Every structure is written in structure tokens, then in C-alpha cells.
């Protein structure tokens, strides 16, 4: 997909879904030649096209390893590193940002990673239509847009209705791991997850950063600006 075609696709999506609640913000962006080449040559091996019917993840990965859903991977650097650290776990990574998709595919090739599959679609629709109940061992959502202004808080991804959609997809014993560098959003995340009887916090409030999660470029920048970082890890118990 060329950069022009990408922008046209985004415009068409907005026209067809004028009032949809989405997991992302469409934005104009430039894809490098290397990112475009990665999409052109690697999508057939590591990309999964959206379908409005349940998918067999074991078949798509060619393995029965544990499955982790990652929503919003940015440029994919942290995703690739997590997959490298956890080679016996499969990662379904979803984002709509073309350059990020291309970059993650490039990282998959460079690092010889076989345990990542990439989707370029709205994660809400993927969760609603493609993921079977009890198909996930974990869910990662790292640094979602905090929508700082109060009037925009309704656009935040981490709200009770979306968590309610995610929960059936998790196996009992599976986990949700969230991270943010916006304290007020961290408080909201804690309140939302704590409101579900079927979720149990693995810490008193905020969790230590698990060993598998590397520091992201976004996170490092925030720390330089004096921001804190909050991780939350909740386990499904019923």
C-alpha cells in the first residue's frame, strides 16, 4: 500500500464509520521505503487480514503456544523485544499506523522472530468479531492515548465497556497488563479493572514493571520529562 493509498483508505474509513468508538486515532503519516518493502514482502508470512468471523489463532500461528494480544504497538520496537524475550509465546499485535506496521514487520525479519503476527485494523472490531472466547492467555495495552483534556476522556480506550468485551476472550488465569505515564489515567485504569469481580489485582495497587516489558522510547522520553510510569497487572479468576 502506498502512502497516498494509505491516506485514501483512512479517509474512506472515516466516511464509513463517522461515529464509531475506535481503539486508535487516524493520522497522516509517511512510510519509508524500507517499511513499505517490509509490508510488500512480509505481510503474506506475518500479516493477518481482518475477517468478521472467528479465527483459529493456533492455525494462523502454526502453533499451540500461549497467545498474547497486544493493542497499539507504535513502531513495534517493544513488541519485537518482548517476543524475543518470550520465544515460547505467540503475540498478535494490532495497530493501524502504517509506518509502525511496516517497521514491526522489518524487525520481525531482522530478528528472525516467528512468534508474532500483525494486524492492521481497529482492535475493537477484532476483539468483537475475530477472537474466540477463551483464546487468549494475556492482553497487553501499553501507553494508550491518555486524551488529556477532560472533555476528551470519553475517547479513552480503557473504559468498562471495552474491558467487558475483552474479558470473555481471556482464559481463566489469563492476565491484562496495562501501562501509562499519565497518573490520572492510571487511576482510572485501576478503578475500571477493580470494578470487575472476575479480575484480581496481582499487586496492592500498581504492579512492578514485569521483566518481559522493556522500556519504550515513549516511556524513556516521559521519564526525562519527570513523568512517572504505572503498570497494572490483573488476572482473570472467573
Swiss-Prot record:
Binding site for substrate: 149, 181, 216-219
Record-listed S-adenosyl-L-methionine binding positions: 70, 95, 122, 145
One Pfam family of this chain: Methyltransf_4
Active site annotation, chain numbering: 145
Matching InterPro entries: SAM-dependent_MTases_sf, tRNA_(Gua-N-7)_MeTrfase_Trmb, tRNA_methyltr_TrmB_bact
Pathway: tRNA modification; N(7)-methylguanine-tRNA biosynthesis
Catalytic activity: guanosine(46) in tRNA + S-adenosyl-L-methionine = N(7)-methylguanosine(46) in tRNA + S-adenosyl-L-homocysteine
EC number assigned by the record: 2.1.1.33
GO function term, MF aspect, one: tRNA (guanine(46)-N7)-methyltransferase activity
GO CC terms of this entry: tRNA methyltransferase complex
Range of residues in the leader sequence: none
Record's keyword terms, sorted: Methyltransferase, S-adenosyl-L-methionine, Transferase, tRNA processing
Protein role: Catalyzes the formation of N(7)-methylguanine at position 46 (m7G46) in tRNA.
Family affiliation: Belongs to the class I-like SAM-binding methyltransferase superfamily. TrmB family.
Protein name, UniProt field: tRNA (guanine-N(7)-)-methyltransferase
Organism from which the protein derives: Neisseria meningitidis serogroup A / serotype 4A (strain DSM 15465 / Z2491)
Gene name in the database record: trmB
Amino acid at each position: 500500500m502506498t502512502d497516498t493509498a494509505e491516506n485514501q483508505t483512512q479517509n474512506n474509513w472515516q466516511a464509513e464509520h463517522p461515529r464509531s468508538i475506535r481503539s486508535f486515532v487516524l493520522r497522516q503519516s509517511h512510510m519509508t521505503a524500507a517499511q513499505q518493502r517490509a509490508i510488500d514482502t512480509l505481510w503474506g508470512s506475518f500479516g493477518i487480514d481482518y475477517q468478521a468471523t472467528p479465527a483459529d489463532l493456533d492455525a494462523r500461528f502454526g502453533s499451540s503456544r500461549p497467545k498474547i494480544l497486544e493493542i497499539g504497538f507504535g513502531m513495534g520496537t517493544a513488541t519485537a523485544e518482548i517476543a524475543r524475550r518470550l520465544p515460547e509465546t505467540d503475540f498478535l499485535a494490532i495497530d493501524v499506523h502504517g509506518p509502525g506496521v511496516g517497521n514491526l514487520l522489518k524487525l520481525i525479519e531482522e530478528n528472525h522472530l516467528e512468534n508474532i503476527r500483525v494486524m492492521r485494523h481497529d482492535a475493537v472490531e477484532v476483539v468483537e468479531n475475530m477472537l474466540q472466547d477463551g483464546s487468549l492467555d494475556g492482553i497487553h495495552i501499553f501507553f494508550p492515548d491518555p486524551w488529556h483534556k477532560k472533555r476528551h476522556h470519553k475517547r479513552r480506550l480503557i473504559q468498562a465497556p471495552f474491558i467487558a468485551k475483552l474479558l470473555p476472550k481471556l482464559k481463566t488465569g489469563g492476565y491484562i497488563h496495562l501501562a501509562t505515564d499519565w497518573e490520572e489515567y492510571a487511576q482510572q485504569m485501576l478503578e475500571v479493572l477493580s470494578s470487575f469481580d472476575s479480575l484480581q489485582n496481582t499487586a496492592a495497587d500498581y504492579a512492578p514493571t514485569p521483566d518481559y516489558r522493556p522500556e519504550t522510547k515513549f516511556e524513556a522520553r516521559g521519564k526525562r520529562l519527570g513523568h512517572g510510569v504505572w503498570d497494572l497487572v490483573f488476572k482473570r479468576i472467573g
